[in-house]
Structure formats: structure tokens, C-alpha cells
Regions:
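Phosphate-handling DNA/RNA-contact segment within nucleic-acid enzymes
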Residues: 1-82
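Replication-associated primase and helicase/ATPase modules
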Residues: 2, 45, 76, 81-86, ...
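Residue-level detector of alpha-helical recognition elements and their boundaries
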Residues: 17-18, 90, 134
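Anionic group-transfer/hydrolysis microenvironments
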Residues: 49, 88-90
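Extracytoplasmic/secreted cell-surface and envelope-processing proteins
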Residues: 54, 93-95
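Alpha-helix N-cap/loop-to-helix initiation residues
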Residues: 68, 91-93
């Protein structure tokens, strides 16, 4: 932010490490890679910075499963129409919550179903195909998905 380092992360590449990522203890209410975001084009929200780097275009890592207040405000106030939510399979409840909120804000929302792998694991080509084949979620489908989790 303003030319200053505001976040970093480390990753182990060992097979089945106990701790895969190491993140600093600091506020996550930032917009990572903000300099590279086109707020007029579709956004892709993912969990981590390595996922965002794999996705390459207009991807914002949430640094977890939740959308922080600063980012949420920026999305709602922006002219962006389409938002793809690509959280890991274990974060489906949070993903549906984000879908519902953004739908209520008048955004066109797409829930990208990752089939057990995160974007970094599946790679750019596979993830791009998933995006291309994802349809917008509507209130009815959202409700069906929420009920299926009960």
C-alpha cells in the first residue's frame, strides 16, 4: 500500500506438510493485488494469493474464506457486474453467504464448483474451462444449495 509491503505469505512444497502456508499476524482488511484489478471487468474471488496468481486475470485473494469489509465495500461501490466466487470445497457455506449478499446488491454472481481442488492445484487451463462453463447463480439455485447442506 503506497509502495509499502502490506502482506506476505510463505508456502511449503513438501508432500503432505503439516502446515502448508505461513501467513503474518496482521490485518487482512486489504485488497491484495489491487494495482492489477480492473474494477469494470468480471472479478474472481479466491482464497489465497497462489490461487490468484494461477488464475492470472482479475483475481482477488480473500486471504481466507471471508470477504473483508474494505473489499466488500469496494466491490459493491464499483461498476463490476459479474463476480465469480471460487472458494475451496470446504468453504461452501461461506461461498453461498457471499453469493447471497452480492446477489442482493444487484451483482451477477457465479459460484465456481472446484471439485475438491483449489485453482492452484488444478492449473490455469482447467480453471479457465470451469469459469467458461459456470452459469450465474439465481436465488432459487442458491436456496437449493443452502438446503442441501442441512
Amino acid at each position: 500500500q503506497n509502495g509499502e509491503l502490506n502482506y506476505f505469505t510463505g508456502r511449503l512444497f513438501e508432500k503432505d506438510p503439516f502446515i502448508k502456508y505461513r501467513n503474518p499476524e496482521c490485518s487482512r482488511d486489504i485488497i491484495p493485488f489491487e494495482l492489477f484489478i480492473n474494477w469494470g471487468s468480471p472479478l474472481i474471488l479466491c482464497e489465497g494469493p497462489f490461487d490468484a496468481m494461477t488464475i492470472k486475470r482479475n483475481a482477488i485473494p480473500l486471504l481466507g474464506k471471508n470477504i473483508q469489509k474494505n473489499l466488500l465495500k469496494r466491490i459493491v461501490e464499483s461498476t463490476v457486474k459479474k463476480i465469480y466466487i471460487a472458494l475451496d470445497t470446504d468453504a461452501i457455506k461461506q461461498a453461498l453467504k457471499h453469493c447471497e449478499y452480492l446477489l442482493n446488491q444487484g451483482k451477477e454472481v457465479y459460484l465456481v464448483e472446484l471439485d475438491g481442488k483449489d485453482p492452484n492445484e488444478m492449473g490455469f487451463s482447467h480453471f479457465t474451462k470451469l469459469i467458461q462453463n459456470t452459469e450465474p447463480i439465481d436465488e432459487f439455485e442458491l436456496m437449493e444449495k443452502k438446503i442441501s447442506l442441512i
